[in-house]
Amino acid sequence: MIPVRCLSCGKPVSAYFNEYQRRVADGEDPKDVLDDLGLKRYCCRRMLISHVETW
């Protein structure tokens, strides 16, 4: 289950999840992908970086 909102600040992050996963799987640096997506807050960035698919 993908994260819908940041647990700390409440910003919606689910809209960025698929793009982030695709680009990182293609070999891009996660930092550069998050910068391009416009995620500046470290709390929002960790929501995508630390997510693990368990299903």
From Swiss-Prot:
Molecular function terms from GO: DNA binding; DNA-directed RNA polymerase activity; zinc ion binding
Broadest EC class assigned to this enzyme: transferase
Compartment(s) of residence: Cytoplasm
Residues holding Zn(2+): C6, C9, C43, C44
Classification via Pfam families: RNA_pol_N
Keyword vocabulary terms for this entry: Cytoplasm, DNA-directed RNA polymerase, Metal-binding, Nucleotidyltransferase, Transcription, Transferase, Zinc
Cofactor: binding details: Binds 1 zinc ion.
Residue pairs linked by disulfide bridges in the UniProt entry: none
Signal peptide from the UniProt entry: none
InterPro entries tied to this protein: RNA_pol_su_RPB10, RNA_pol_suN_Zn-BS, RPABC5/Rpb10
Cofactor names: Zn(2+)
Transmembrane segments: none
GO CC list: cytoplasm; DNA-directed RNA polymerase complex
UniProt keyword annotation of Ribonucleoprotein present: no
GO biological process, alphabetically ordered: DNA-templated transcription
Reactions it catalyzes: RNA(n) + a ribonucleoside 5'-triphosphate = RNA(n+1) + diphosphate
EC identifiers of the protein: 2.7.7.6
Assembly: Part of the RNA polymerase complex.
Role this protein plays: DNA-dependent RNA polymerase (RNAP) catalyzes the transcription of DNA into RNA using the four ribonucleoside triphosphates as substrates.
NCBIfam families: PRK04016.1
Family: Belongs to the archaeal Rpo10/eukaryotic RPB10 RNA polymerase subunit family.
Stated name of the protein: DNA-directed RNA polymerase subunit Rpo10
Organism name: Methanothermobacter thermautotrophicus (strain ATCC 29096 / DSM 1053 / JCM 10044 / NBRC 100330 / Delta H) (Methanobacterium thermoautotrophicum)
